Amino acid sequence: MTPIKVVVHGASGKMGQEVLKTLCQENNLLPVGAVDIRAKSPALPLPDGSGSIPYSADLSSVLSQTKPDVMVDFTIAKASMPAIRIAAAHKVNLVIGTTGFSPEEISEIEQLAKTNDIGIIVAPNFALGAIIMVHLAQEASRFLASAEVIELHHDKKLDSPSGTALATAAAMLKTRGEAFNKPAKENMSDARGQEHDGIRVHSVRLPGLLAHQEVIFGAAGQSLTIRHDAFSRECYMPGVVLAIKEIVQTKGFVFGLDKLLKL
C-alpha cells in the first residue's frame, strides 16, 4: 500500500510535534513537509531521527514541493483559515484540529470542500474518549432536562468556551429537540457561564491542566456526571490517524470525529 503523504501545519506547536512523532510511527503514513510561522531553517529533523523534511513558513511553497495527500492543521483560527484556502486550492485533503471558527468560517470551509472536490474534516476533539463522552451526554439529554457543561484547559488555550464544549452543548440540544430547563431565579447571571438554550457552559483556564470536561445533569433527588480527562496529547493521536486515513477516501465536508466512528 502506498503511504499517505502528510504535511503538518503548525509543526512547531505541541500538537504539531505530537502529530509528527505519530506519523513517523505509522507504516502507512509518511510525513513529507512541515509548515510554521516560526520556521527558521529549510529542513526540520524528524522526531525519530530518520531524516528531515522541507520546513517553511510558506505553505504554498511546501505544498508545491511535496505534493501531499493530506494536510493536518493544529494552529489557531486566524492562521488556519488562510492555510485552509491555500491547501484547498492545491487540491489537498484536510484534517483540521484547530478550534474557534465562526459559523461563517465553517460554512466557507464546507464550500471549499465542495468547490475543490476534496475531503475536509473539522473536529473539535480527536480523543476517542471525548467523542464517547459527547455521545453519552446526547443519550442522557433524551431523559434529563437540566444540564451544565464545565470545561477545564491549560492557561495557554486562547478560545473559550472550548470547541468541544460548544459542540457538546449543540449535540445535546439537537438530541433533546428543545431547550433545557433554566433556574427560576438567578441573582448573578454573569457568574453563571455562557448560556446555550438552558445549558450553562463554564470555562476554567489554569496552569497544570491539559484538557478536561464534565457534563452534569440534575433531576429531583439525583445527578449524573459524565467526565473525560486528557492527561497527555498522545490521547488525540488515534483519532488523528483515523481521520487522515478516512479523509483521503472522502469527498466533501465532515464536522466531528463521531461521523467517522458512526456513533
UniProtKB/Swiss-Prot annotation:
Keywords: Amino-acid biosynthesis, Cytoplasm, Diaminopimelate biosynthesis, Lysine biosynthesis, NAD, NADP, Oxidoreductase. Its EC number is 1.17.1.8. InterPro entries: DapB_C, DapB_N, DapB_N_CS, DHDPR_bac, NAD(P)-bd_dom_sf. Its main location: cytoplasm. Pfam families: DapB_C, DapB_N. It comes from the Bacteria. (S)-2,3,4,5-tetrahydrodipicolinate binds at H154, G163, T164. It is found in: Cytoplasm. This is 4-hydroxy-tetrahydrodipicolinate reductase. Pathway: Amino-acid biosynthesis; L-lysine biosynthesis via DAP pathway; (S)-tetrahydrodipicolinate from L-aspartate: step 4/4. The active site is at H153 (proton donor/acceptor), K157 (proton donor). It catalyses: (S)-2,3,4,5-tetrahydrodipicolinate + NAD(+) + H2O = (2S,4S)-4-hydroxy-2,3,4,5-tetrahydrodipicolinate + NADH + H(+); (S)-2,3,4,5-tetrahydrodipicolinate + NADP(+) + H2O = (2S,4S)-4-hydroxy-2,3,4,5-tetrahydrodipicolinate + NADPH + H(+). NAD(+) binds at G10, A11, S12, G13, K14, M15, G97, T98, T99, A123, P124, N125, F126. Belongs to the DapB family. Signal peptide: none annotated. GO terms for cellular component: cytosol. PROSITE patterns: DAPB. Catalyzes the conversion of 4-hydroxy-tetrahydrodipicolinate (HTPA) to tetrahydrodipicolinate. One of its GO terms (biological process) is lysine biosynthetic process via diaminopimelate. Transmembrane segments: none annotated. One of its GO terms (molecular function) is NAD binding. NADP(+) binds at R38.
